């Protein structure tokens, strides 16, 4: 306000100084007296209009104008900050992952949800299969890689002739009789009884096993009598 007043006083002093200067020139030249008076009046009116317009504009910018003063005061906010723009609102970005979980856990959870929705299963999840699952997949039985040790009963079912000789090398006498009708294998049973030799050789036992014969047997063998070499 003080600066505007000082400016107005300065303008008035300049106008008055110009008016007195023109008045002195008019006294020196009487023929131009009427022109000088109209010129002074015109200048004063022009300066007054300019000053009034400037003062009115200054009052309007301060909110003290007579026409718009009441409306401007009614629109003011309680904190006298009615010209300030509203505070910027926080931009809510899309939630990429929950703050409670790390990005790795979120990706793992997302992959599990995706597999569950699409019906896909990872190979690592189903590497270990049970024996029951293998039986359902392969009708012949479980995979020999997982179950290398098989029982005697399983081998009998697989091989009608009997178990695998690699697993069961020691066979009993009864099994050999079934395999070989003539009798057991002589490699397993080298010592045979006298009764078995009689069945094998109708003439009697093998002389290699029974070299010492009785006197009664020699009589039956040689009617002339026993051999003088033995007796």
UniProtKB/Swiss-Prot annotation:
Segments for region (Disordered)? 116-231
Q: Which GO terms describe its cellular component?
A: extracellular region; host cell cytoplasm; host extracellular space
Q: Where are the A- repeats?
A: 127-135, 148-156, 169-177, 190-198, 211-219
**Where does the record place its CLE- repeats?**
136-147, 157-168, 178-189, 199-210, 220-231
Name the Gene Ontology biological process terms.
cell differentiation
Q: Where are the transmembrane segments?
A: none
Q: In which tissues is it expressed?
A: Highly expressed exclusively within the dorsal esophageal gland cell during syncytium formation in host plants.
5 X approximate repeat A as annotated region, ranges? 127-219
Keyword Cytoplasm set for record:
no
Tell me the InterPro entries matching this sequence.
CLAVATA3-CLE
Q: Where is the signal peptide?
A: 1-21
**Region span, 5 X approximate repeat CLE:** 136-231
As for subcellular location, the record says: Secreted; Host cytoplasm; Host extracellular space; Secreted, Extracellular space, Apoplast
The record's function comment reads: Mimics host plant CLE extracellular signal peptides that regulate cell fate. May play a role in the differentiation or division of feeding cells (syncytia) induced in plant roots during infection.
- What is the similarity comment for this entry? Belongs to the CLV3/ESR signal peptide family.
This protein is called what? Answer: CLAVATA3/ESR (CLE)-related protein 4B-2
Give the species this sequence originates from.
Globodera rostochiensis
Q: Which gene encodes it?
A: CLE-4B-2
């Amino acid at each position: 306000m003080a600066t505007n007043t000082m400016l107005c006083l300065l303008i008035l002093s300049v106008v008055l100084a110009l008016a007195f200067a023109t008045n002195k020139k008019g006294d020196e030249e009487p023929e131009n007296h009427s022109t000088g008076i109209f010129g002074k009046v015109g200048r004063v009116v022009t300066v007054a209009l300019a000053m009034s317009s400037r003062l009115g504009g200054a009052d309007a910018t301060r909110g003290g104008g007579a026409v718009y003063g009441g409306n401007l005061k009614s629109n003011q906010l309680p904190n006298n900050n009615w010209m300030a723009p509203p505070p910027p609102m926080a931009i809510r970005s899309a939630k990429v992952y929950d703050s409670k979980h790390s990005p790795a856990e979120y990706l793992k959870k997302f992959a599990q949800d995706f597999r569950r929705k699409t019906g896909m299963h990872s190979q690592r999840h189903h590497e270990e299969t049970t024996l029951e699952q293998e039986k359902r997949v392969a009708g012949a039985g479980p995979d020999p890689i997982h179950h290398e040790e098989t029982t005697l009963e399983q081998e009998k079912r697989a091989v009608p002739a009997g178990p695998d000789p690699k697993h069961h090398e020691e066979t009993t006498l009864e099994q050999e009789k079934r395999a070989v009708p003539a009798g057991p294998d002589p490699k397993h049973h080298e010592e045979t009884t006298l009764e078995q030799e009689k069945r094998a050789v109708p003439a009697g036992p093998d002389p290699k096993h029974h070299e010492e014969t009785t006197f009664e047997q020699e009589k039956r063998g040689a009617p002339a009598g026993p051999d003088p070499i033995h007796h």
